[in-house]
């Protein structure tokens, strides 16, 4: 029993700043003792399907973009990557599809990438949102939905946290002439 007679659970019920409510104060980050088998950039699947090309006479055409939809060869992980690429974000729904627990999915992602499942998902969503902002003329709301972040507010908060920029300013900073329309969904 703890000093208040309630056991040790009282430690985890203390007030915490917003965003840390599910992480105990004594949480220690897990780390792989070896290099992850699959670095993030090797497993990311772009949402774009077509790439723009210019002919010698100046006409524009689009061809199928070569995308590796199974970058790891591990079926369940490749399915998970495709699930995220489709703009889905609920890890529990994905776990239920396979009859697994959320901790099973989290452990799989950790073993393969060295990242916690929720951190991997967030990085995937931010990376996809960045690509959508750069290469498309989608509205902020469409980018938020397509990337799996859900709402424009979530997109804004995530980009402020990651880049210290609002999504619209990020788009202006990253985009170069000719970027819009280079790829199509």
Identify the residue ranges that each predicted region occupies.
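Short amphipathic alpha-helical surface patches that serve as generic macromolecular interface elements
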Residues: 123-126, 140, 156
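Short, intrinsically disordered/low-complexity patches at protein termini
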Residues: 128-130, 158, 175-181
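Pre-recognition alpha-helix immediately N-terminal to the DNA-recognition helix
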Residues: 72-79, 121-131
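Residues in the recognition helix of alpha-helical DNA-binding motifs
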Residues: 108, 112, 120, 157-162, ...
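Alpha-helical bundle regulatory/interaction domains
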Residues: 1-85, 91-92, 96-104, 112, ...
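Short hydrophobic/aromatic patches on the structural cores and recognition surfaces of FHA
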Residues: 105, 129, 155
